[in-house]
Amino acid sequence: MSAIENFDAHTPMMQQYLRLKAQHPEILLFYRMGDFYELFYDDAKRASQLLDISLTKRGASAGEPIPMAGIPYHAVENYLAKLVNQGESVAICEQIGDPATSKGPVERKVVRIVTPGTISDEALLQERQDNLLAAIWQDSKGFGYATLDISSGRFRLSEPADRETMAAELQRTNPAELLYAEDFAEMSLIEGRRGLRRRPLWEFEIDTARQQLNLQFGTRDLVGFGVENAPRGLCAAGCLLQYAKDTQRTTLPHIRSITMEREQDSIIMDAATRRNLEITQNLAGGAENTLASVLDCTVTPMGSRMLKRWLHMPVRDTRVLLERQQTIGALQDFTAGLQPVLRQVGDLERILARLALRTARPRDLARMRHAFQQLPELRAQLETVDSAPVQALREKMGEFAELRDLLERAIIDTPPVLVRDGGVIASGYNEELDEWRALADGATDYLERLEVRERERTGLDTLKVGFNAVHGYYIQISRGQSHLAPINYMRRQTLKNAERYIIPELKEYEDKVLTSKGKALALEKQLYEELFDLLLPHLEALQQSASALAELDVLVNLAERAYTLNYTCPTFIDKPGIRITEGRHPVVEQVLNEPFIANPLNLSPQRRMLIITGPNMGGKSTYMRQTALIALMAYIGSYVPAQKVEIGPIDRIFTRVGAADDLASGRSTFMVEMTETANILHNATEYSLVLMDEIGRGTSTYDGLSLAWACAENLANKIKALTLFATHYFELTQLPEKMEGVANVHLDALEHGDTIAFMHSVQDGAASKSYGLAVAALAGVPKEVIKRARQKLRELESISPNAAATQVDGTQMSLLSVPEETSPAVEALENLDPDSLTPRQALEWIYRLKSLV
């Protein structure tokens, strides 16, 4: 900023601004001046563009007009939300000195920094979505990655071993803000991500990190958290914690532990798999028609966020899964009673975070009170549920009768938004406050009595007593009667049609009332702060309660979904394999207008790979995806859309389904396809579930076929993964004859004339034909193009039996499977009965056939 070059030429107020701005050069500074937050110089220009507000000038300082933009303090949340959504950070600078006693500019300081990853304000957060701050670190041995949800205190770290795993973690967590070291080598991994923040190297120093974390948790070492031997993760966590403290400018008591996320604890899904399975986001980037949209009927925002975390991190510990299954089964008869009560609990998790940060507002405390009021009813309903896990949740939930009583006494029923407006603390809670309020509230009665008395004394019927924010209390007399005003009336203000006066008695009362209002407000703020001190010692128990309530919400929701959508409880088995009876796609069955065709699936060590053939639109992709989604649902502990499911251990789910050009990275469809395939072949194991759809279609026929064949061979023979391999290369249906553990299945279609009906039913064996031209006709390709395609197909078939789709034995199949028109001569011959012809008739037929050829 050029303004700093001639610092001494500026006014004292602008010097103060420039000093504060120099401490936060990269971010916008909201500088409090009275009822406005002002921005100056480059900040003003940026803010005017980002917020679409007027850019004006404020006088001159150092001989130059100062660009300025301002926003009213009471509307600051709306403007902050806009800036945060655009990835901006804002330093909030408040007046902390008293203007009445200040010599020179009022003392100001930055009280907090609002950044996309550290927001906790309700207005700035998406209710049903986690908002994560993350830090990434890299050395020669791999990556370190840490995430913090400041609105709940959830602190996690991991150590992804390679680039693919790191990319998958970034996709899964989708941080709002990402801190990285200034020498970070893999910039291509994070380029284009929102909220990137470059940090100095020393912030990632391991010893500092250990010191910071021990200080935060009040421990001597980190052994108890299981992170002692995770140096890369700790480097990231140390930087992240320091950044959170710097921005919040306060202690963070709700961050009490850190958890190590290990690969072996959950089913790993790479970025492509999460995208293709449309877990919480569809391929178009929306939330409709996703797995979460079907499964998430939770009634609290914190429950919704927990369910989405479960969906993105399916657990492999069968003890946890069996416990969840048992709980869902036990709760099925109780959902109708529990859900309306749970809905009243609200977002206790985030309210507690704001309490810890001391930014909770009066309505937060009122909502907390309302949540506490639901606990007795919830505990009473759960008491009759015969399930140990449910009873454990009930205990963890607690009751907090004392805190409920405290908030019922302290906070009025419907408090205002902000404590600075007063009227938050209930009457009867504090005797001194009640006295000051009585004095302030008695003003109305006093003024009415004074008005009646003065009218009678003076005989002036236009006399009125009132109050004005600028001039205070006054006695008003119309211009026509003002000459009759008593001698002790001192003129205070002249209006067009009236005169306003003050008398010593009224002035004295005014001082008393204004003093009492000020004292009442100051005492109210003090009592409000003391409430925090009374609540915060219970923070740990309250956070446990919020976690239990969120988990209960998720499990009650899954119980309701299982009952409503006719799901069944899957069985876990020890050996790799998946056996599904009448499986359904959880999302597709909800959007179809007609009944969904359920299909079986059988994968086992003896039947590891299914080669899936059939027409386009026949349902191959749906069949494959539904298998992966059923597996994923089973591994969050949910019931699943099928009649019966048995499922073995799964370590990873891979999908190579569909592809689009990655133009931004300069990668073609085929390059994207091969990159994803390489990742699968390098990382899949015999416990992995692999979906491969149309491998090799992005290149020439023989190249594609060769690649598809080699990939299938590798997966079946070497890796031995559980694989669903969909293809249009009919040559691949020969694989079961050449290797063990491979089987053919197909999806059928029926033709009638020029129309085609897809049966969506999975049958054993290979498909007998393809239906490419029929699907093209169905899509509306012009008839002359279809006709020309048929001609070309016949030409190709006559040249080479392999040029188009072939049967397993190598003979050519018609893609449309409409037989060629029969020759009239052949038709006539077929209708002839040679034994019934006379010699004369036979000769006539020879001439007739000759003419037909």
From Swiss-Prot:
Entry's Gene Ontology BP terms: DNA damage response; mismatch repair; regulation of DNA recombination
GO MF entry, a single one: identical protein binding
One Pfam family cited in the UniProt record for this chain: MutS_III
GO-annotated cellular components: cytosol; mismatch repair complex; MutS complex
Keyword DNA repair: yes
Listed SUPFAM superfamilies: DNA repair protein MutS, domain I, DNA repair protein MutS, domain II, DNA repair protein MutS, domain III, P-loop containing nucleoside triphosphate hydrolases
Record: residues binding ATP: G614, P615, N616, M617, G618, G619, K620, S621
Keyword DNA-binding attached: yes
Keywords: ATP-binding, DNA damage, DNA repair, DNA-binding, Nucleotide-binding
Family: Belongs to the DNA mismatch repair MutS family.
Reported function: This protein is involved in the repair of mismatches in DNA. It is possible that it carries out the mismatch recognition step. This protein has a weak ATPase activity.
Protein name: DNA mismatch repair protein MutS
Source species of the chain: Escherichia coli (strain K12)
GN (gene name): mutS
